[in-house]
């Protein structure tokens, strides 16, 4: 089966081709036009997707050495995401599927991230997956879910306010780091001391207001952002400049510490022997190191996607479509699919 996947949920335009479960191409174009604004501008993102969707699709097909006539299925992100951006890819994919007379599959962007650690592991052909704990962390989402072998899942924890990726970006911006600040914190923190200052870790065993959070797998990062801002305002500029790497390492340690404690705690509480970490924040080097150490300590298998598949990409869209189709879990044709902006709007 040859699947063309398309992804336009935020600021990456991506096209990928999956042939019998193998990724033959995964073309990604990251939009640089937002850098001067310090964040993604939705209208600019939509216009860039409109400009790029055709050449990206053509590049994905060319790299995979196939033509439009070879395509069996077309899959695209239907959300969550920036609604205008989602509509560009969704309407293009539906129109292309209709014109070619092939089935169209709508894919939930966050669900696709959940299964991205298993790309290239021969799972799209129907091999076993699950059960595992999924920790999905990005700029817009932070959630924990129990994923079963039949690909269904139950969300057991989610952020009550801000996502981990947003916490990285906003605190990095407070430090004067360039956009996107998350990767900049990761690089700078390598030169710093994570024990320099202890920032709060809400809803964890280390929280000052902790009662019993053993069975609470929700997240909260708004307090961390406020704490960092308040602390920085109390310091002299010279001090901040001198210790910027230490501050970055301390912020990163607080965010990563929460993510690791929650994910490992969920696996142990529910007696599940595997954790899959996904989403843009899964590219963070300290999260990978700390999660690996914690999983080794407790005998838990760890799955993290390669850097290529950590950020938004169309290979994960095509892979999840292939997984579901191989199990007969999703209708082949849904031309009436409407885009949705939030994860809850998808009925999850």
From Swiss-Prot:
This is tRNA N6-adenosine threonylcarbamoyltransferase. The lineage of its organism: Bacteria, Pseudomonadati, Chlorobiota, Chlorobiia, Chlorobiales. Substrate binds at residues 136-140, 169, 182, 186, 284. It comes from Chlorobium luteolum (strain DSM 273 / BCRC 81028 / 2530) (Pelodictyon luteolum). Belongs to the KAE1 / TsaD family. It holds the Pfam family TsaD. CDD domains: ASKHA_NBD_TsaD_bac. It comes from the Bacteria. It catalyses: L-threonylcarbamoyladenylate + adenosine(37) in tRNA = N(6)-L-threonylcarbamoyladenosine(37) in tRNA + AMP + H(+). It is found in: Cytoplasm. Its main location: cytoplasm. Required for the formation of a threonylcarbamoyl group on adenosine at position 37 (t(6)A37) in tRNAs that read codons beginning with adenine. Is involved in the transfer of the threonylcarbamoyl moiety of threonylcarbamoyl-AMP (TC-AMP) to the N6 group of A37, together with TsaE and TsaB. TsaD likely plays a direct catalytic role in this reaction.
């Amino acid at each position: 089966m040859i699947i063309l996947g398309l992804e336009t949920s935020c600021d990456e335009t991506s096209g990928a081709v999956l042939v019998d479960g193998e990724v033959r191409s995964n073309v990604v174009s990251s939009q640089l036009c937002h850098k001067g604004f310090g964040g993604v501008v939705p209208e600019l993102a939509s216009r860039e997707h409109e400009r790029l969707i055709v050449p990206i699709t053509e590049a994905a097909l060319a790299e995979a050495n196939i033509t439009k006539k070879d395509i069996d299925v077309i899959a695209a992100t239907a959300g969550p995401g920036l609604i205008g951006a989602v509509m560009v890819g969704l309407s293009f994919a539906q129109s292309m599927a209709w014109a070619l007379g092939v089935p169209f599959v709508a894919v939930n962007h966050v669900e696709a991230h959940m299964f991205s650690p298993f790309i290239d592991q021969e799972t799209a052909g129907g091999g076993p997956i699950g059960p595992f704990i999924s920790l999905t962390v990005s700029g817009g989402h932070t959630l924990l879910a129990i994923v079963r072998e039949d690909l269904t899942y139950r969300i057991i924890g989610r952020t009550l306010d801000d996502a981990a990726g947003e916490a990285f970006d906003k605190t990095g911006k407070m430090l004067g780091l360039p956009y996107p600040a998350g990767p900049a914190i990761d690089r700078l923190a390598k030169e710093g001391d994570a024990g320099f200052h202890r920032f709060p870790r809400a809803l964890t065993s280390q929280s000052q207001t902790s009662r019993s959070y053993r069975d609470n797998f929700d997240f909260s990062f708004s307090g961390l952002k406020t704490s960092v801002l308040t602390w920085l305002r109390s310091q002299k500029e010279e001090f901040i400049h001198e210790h910027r790497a230490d501050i970055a390492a301390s912020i990163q340690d607080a965010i990563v510490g929460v993510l690791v404690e929650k994910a490992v705690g969920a696996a142990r509480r529910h007696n599940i022997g595997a954790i899959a970490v996904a989403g843009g924040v899964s590219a963070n080097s300290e999260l990978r190191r700390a999660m690996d150490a914690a999983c080794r300590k407790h005998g838990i298998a760890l799955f993290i996607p390669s850097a290529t598949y950590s950020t938004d990409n169309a290979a994960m869209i095509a892979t999840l479509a292939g997984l579901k189709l191989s199990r007969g879990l999703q209708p082949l044709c849904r031309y009436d699919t409407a885009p949705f902006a939030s994860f809850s709007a998808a009925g999850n």
